[in-house]
Amino acid sequence: MKNISSAISFQEKPEECKRLLADADLIFMLDHNTVAREGDLENWVVASPAGRVIIDHHPDPDPQQYVISDTQVSSTCELLYIVMSQIWGKEIVTPDIAGALYTGINTDTGGLSHNSSHPQTYRIIADLLEAGLDKAYIHERIYQMNNLSRLRLIGNVLLNKLEVNEQYPVAIMPITREELDRYNYKDGDLEGLVNIPLSVHNVCVSVQITERRERVKLSFR
């Protein structure tokens, strides 16, 4: 996506992120419902004098924040489009903005395979196409570009770590920190992995347990 190189990662530049948060007038928190989901950033977000706005589609948003929330939309990017178009009109959406919004809608719905049964979602995608969205380019960047270490990490998990309970329709994938380090894990390398076991007949629940530094992350589908 255009300008993604200008995004600042807390993992890579923590001091710069802290400075920006301290100097901010307003902080937007997208696709999570509480500041507690900020992880390592939480303390710095809370300490900032800036106002905080949550834009999210998950249930039970933090009532202490300014909240724009709708659990009926497919994704936060769908909600973001609605907010933007209501404030500035549809003409605010450039081809680059359309690409960014479609990327969020597509990835948050598993390629429009879940959480996307409402006609509104497809009407918004039509609006994005009219705004200049290059859908084929986005699909290629999301689904057809991999690095070798990511493929090997996913292959190892599916071959050696995936467990399916024969009594209950549950698949479990435990992933250790040592395995992440062995395959040079980078943020995003496990994106979508938790959905794969759901393609197995009779598996209704998929659980991914990922050991991170100082915490364990559980992902459910």
Locate each region found by the language model:
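Hydrophobic helix-and-loop "lid/oligomerization" segment in the mid-to-C-terminal part
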Residues: M1-N3, K18, D23-A24, T109-R221
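Short glycine-rich anion-binding loops that position phosphate/pyrophosphate groups of nucleotides
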Residues: H32-V35, H58-D60, R177-E178, R212
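Short alpha-helices
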Residues: I55-I124
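Structural motif
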Residues: D25-F28, G51-V53, V205
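Short glycine-/acidic-enriched loop or helix-start segments at secondary-structure transitions
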Residues: R37-D40, Q64, L218
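Redox-cofactor binding/interface segments in oxidoreductases and associated redox assembly factors
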Residues: M29-D31, D56, Q208
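Active-site regions of enzymes building and remodeling cell-envelope glycoconjugates
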Residues: I4-S9, A50-R52, Q65-D70
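N-terminal small/polar loop signature for handling phosphorylated ligands or for N-terminal nucleophile
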Residues: M1-A47
